[in-house]
Every structure is written in structure tokens, then in C-alpha cells.
A protein has these predicted regions:
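A juxtamembrane structural motif centered on a specific transmembrane helix
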Residues: 149-208
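Signal for well-folded cores of large energy- and translation-related assemblies
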Residues: 9, 47-50, 67, 99, ...
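Loop-to-helix entry and N-terminal half of a specific, functionally important transmembrane alpha helix
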Residues: 123-163, 169
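Interfacial loop-to-helix junctions that mark the boundaries of transmembrane helices
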Residues: 13-14, 52, 168-169
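Lipid-exposed faces of alpha-helical membrane segments in multi-pass integral membrane proteins
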Residues: 1-5, 22-30, 105-116, 138, ...
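Alpha-helical transmembrane bundle and helix-membrane interface signal
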Residues: 1-37, 123-129, 186-203
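Hydrophobic, glycine- and aromatic-enriched re-entrant/interface helices and adjoining loop segments
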Residues: 16-108, 128-136
């Protein structure tokens, strides 16, 4: 998804874009059929209750956590599912625990903050002075946005598990370091844009 989005933003003509997109769509089912564990993940996604103690266990426990949270949650540190019921509760399925402790309202507030961050990233990309900064800011924003959406879809059982963490929230070493570094780069581009605008205003005032 990220590669296709970056190619599109890079200005590739639509017919060439389709030449890449169509084989990629055809390759997805082939890649799923090649590995048995991918088929198991797909079957668990389609019907988790068919194997409630095996492949479907994680998704079922995730849905239990979200359902237990209700509208306003059970309260901070009052989650039950994180105590060895939900696997990877601190990483891939941290959103389920957030939903259990803070409820649907808490998840909505979290996603509102995510939308604000994505908006800031898009604005930074749009205000970039050069094409490289535009692509870099767009790439960082897309990585964050795509990972956030995919993680939410996995936790809610909308798509099969992918193993992607929730950026800036999930625990982890490499993923967290890379995400923080990416946000630092995005902030650097935003700051340079602000400095360029300030310099431009100063030059205009001097000319007047």
C-alpha cells in the first residue's frame, strides 16, 4: 500500500500505475495459498469461533475486551483481558486494552488525536519547498496513517491479523524507535517550512 501510494504521489502516469497494481492484486491470494499459516489466519478471521482455543483465540479475546469496555470503559488499570487472556496485549492488540479501559469514547478521542497528527503531516507535505521534502513528509504520514488504520481493523476483526503495531502506542524496540525518528524528521520538515515562510515575510517587508 505504501509503495503504491508513494508511486502515485511521485507523479507516475495512471496507466503505469495500473500495470503495477493489477499484478499486486493477483499476487495476494497466491501468496496466501503458498503458506499454511496464512491460510490459518484467514480461516480464523472468517470464523474465529470455529477454533476458539487455537487460531481464533486471539481475535475472540480482543472482541471480549472491546465488548467489556462498553461506552466508557472499566477504568484505568482495570482491564481483565491483559492478564494472560489476550496475547500480545501490550503490542499488536494494545488498542483492545485501551477500548476495555477507556471504552468506545476513549478510542474515539485517541483516533481524533491520530487524525490531527495525520492532518499536520499532510499540511507539512503540502507546504514543503521541494519535491523531496514533499515525498518524505508524505511517506512518514502515510506509514503512520496506514499502520494505525490496519491495526484498528485487525483488532476489530475487520481484516486478518497482520502483526503491525499501533504507532506511538504499542510497546516495542525497533518499531518505536523508527516511529519516533520518523516523527522527528516530519517535525524537522515542518520547522524548516515555518522558517522559510518567516524569511519570505521578512524579505517582503524589506522590499516594501
Amino acid at each position: 500500500l505504501l509503495m503504491l501510494a508513494m508511486i502515485f504521489l511521485g507523479g507516475m502516469k495512471f496507466r503505469y500505475f495500473l500495470i503495477i497494481l493489477v499484478p499486486a492484486l493477483v499476487a495476494v491470494p497466491v501468496l496466501i495459498l503458498m503458506e499454511p499459516y496464512r491460510l490459518l489466519r484467514l480461516s480464523a478471521f472468517l470464523d474465529p469461533w470455529a477454533s476458539p482455543k487455537d487460531e481464533g483465540y486471539q481475535l475472540i479475546q480482543s472482541l471480549y475486551a472491546l465488548g467489556n469496555g462498553g461506552w466508557f470503559g472499566t477504568g484505568l488499570f482495570r482491564s481483565r483481558q491483559k492478564y494472560r487472556f489476550l496475547p500480545f496485549a501490550e503490542s499488536d492488540f494494545i488498542l483492545s486494552i485501551i477500548g476495555e479501559e477507556f471504552g468506545f469514547v476513549g478510542i474515539c478521542i485517541l483516533f481524533l488525536l491520530c487524525v490531527v497528527l495525520i492532518y499536520k503531516g499532510i499540511r507539512t507535505a503540502a507546504e514543503s519547498d521541494d519535491f523531496f521534502s514533499f515525498l518524505l513528509a508524505s511517506g512518514v504520514t502515510l506509514v503512520y496513517g496506514i499502520q494505525t488504520v490496519i491495526n484498528a481493523l485487525v483488532v476489530s476483526g475487520t481484516i486478518p491479523p497482520t502483526g503491525l503495531p499501533l504507532p506511538l502506542i504499542s510497546s516495542g524496540n525497533t518499531s518505536l524507535v523508527i516511529t519516533m525518528a520518523s516523527m522527528g524528521i516530519l517535525y524537522g520538515i515542518s520547522r524548516r517550512n515555518a522558517m522559510s515562510r518567516a524569511e519570505g515575510k521578512t524579505v517582503n517587508k524589506r522590499r516594501r
